[in-house]
Regions:
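Short glycine-enriched, charge-decorated loop/helix-capping segments at active-site entrances
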Residues: 13-21, 64-65
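Short phosphate-binding loop-to-helix
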Residues: 57-91, 147-150
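Short, glycine-/small-residue-rich phosphate/pyrophosphate-handling segment
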Residues: 136-157
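Conserved alpha/beta core of the MobA/IspD/sugar-nucleotide pyrophosphorylase nucleotidyltransferase superfamily
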Residues: 153-200
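Conserved donor-nucleotide/metal-binding helix-loop-beta segment in metal-dependent transferases, i.e.
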Residues: 100-125
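Acidic donor-binding segment of Leloir-type glycosyltransferases
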Residues: 42-63
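N-terminal nucleotide-binding beta1-loop-alpha1 segment
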Residues: 1-13
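A short, N-terminal amphipathic alpha-helix
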Residues: 25-43
């Protein structure tokens, strides 16, 4: 699931520190990195964009869809429901986790064979990956989206539903300037942001 790479639409918290142009450049690199990991994993991949515009044509390799729903939970649920019409299982990832790897995706795919739910927790209280074999609206009820309780709320729901759950290693997303500084070893971060700013 991703937003199209449009200036002013993506990484707004990061843009407050580095500017819209740098934030867009970093986001595009994150998007392309995420896509590359998905391709190398060998897992069939579709992209659900928050909206469609001419920029998504740059990613012709993937089947593209539009996200539908009033909040993030509904958009995730609807995307799962659509994919699981033709698949036995589905992994859903965002596009801002710089440490996402082929191994992580393949580990999640394998774990889902013997579980109901796979979650990759992020250190901000959310998750960078969720995997399901069945789309259940109850899993996404009463979740305070975009807060530090998303992971906890989801786990509470999973326990209540009796879902066998596997947790992947915790990773982090790039949402703001402090997150970006943690990933300065990545080429796109060093090239996209003024070195003086990175030293703050």
């Amino acid at each position: 699931m991703a937003k199209p790479p449009v200036m002013g639409l993506v990484k707004t918290r990061l843009a407050a520190s580095v500017g819209d142009e740098s934030a867009l450049r970093i986001y595009r690199e994150l998007l392309e990195f995420t896509f590359s990991q998905a391709v190398e994993s060998g897992i069939k991949t579709s992209v659900y964009f928050s909206e469609l515009d001419q920029f998504v044509d740059d990613f012709a390799l993937f089947e593209k869809h539009i996200q539908t729903g009033d909040d993030l939970g509904q958009r995730i649920l609807n995307s799962f429901s659509n994919e699981l019409q033709d698949a036995d299982a589905c992994l859903m990832i965002g596009a801002d986790c710089p440490d996402l790897s082929v191994d992580t995706l393949q580990q999640a795919e394998k774990a889902l064979e013997k579980s109901d739910l796979v979650l990759g927790p992020s250190d901000d209280g959310g998750y960078y990956l969720i995997g399901l074999k069945k789309s259940d609206p109850a899993l996404f009820k009463n979740v305070a989206w975009s807060t530090e309780t998303v992971m906890g709320n989801t786990m509470d729901n999973a326990i209540g539903l009796g879902m066998k759950t596997v947790l992947l290693p915790q990773l982090y997303d790039i949402d703001d300037f402090q997150d970006l500084k943690r990933s300065r070893f990545l080429a796109f971060a060093a090239e996209s942001v003024n070195n003086d700013l990175m030293n703050l």
